[in-house]
């Protein structure tokens, strides 16, 4: 799960 604010 990517960090909040990162679109992946």
Curated annotation (Swiss-Prot):
Belongs to the bradykinin-related peptide family. One of its GO terms (molecular function) is toxin activity. Expressed by the skin glands. It comes from Pithecopus nordestinus. Vasodilator. May target bradykinin receptors (BDKRB). The keyword Metal-binding does not apply. This is Bradykinin-related peptide Pnor-7. The lineage of its organism: Eukaryota, Metazoa, Chordata, Craniata, Vertebrata. Keywords: Amphibian defense peptide, Bradykinin receptor impairing toxin, G-protein coupled receptor impairing toxin, Secreted, Toxin, Vasoactive, Vasodilator. The keyword Secreted applies. GO terms for biological process: defense response; vasodilation. GO terms for cellular component: extracellular region. It comes from the Eukaryota. Its main location: secreted. It is found in: Secreted.
């Amino acid at each position: 799960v990517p960090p909040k604010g990162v679109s992946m």
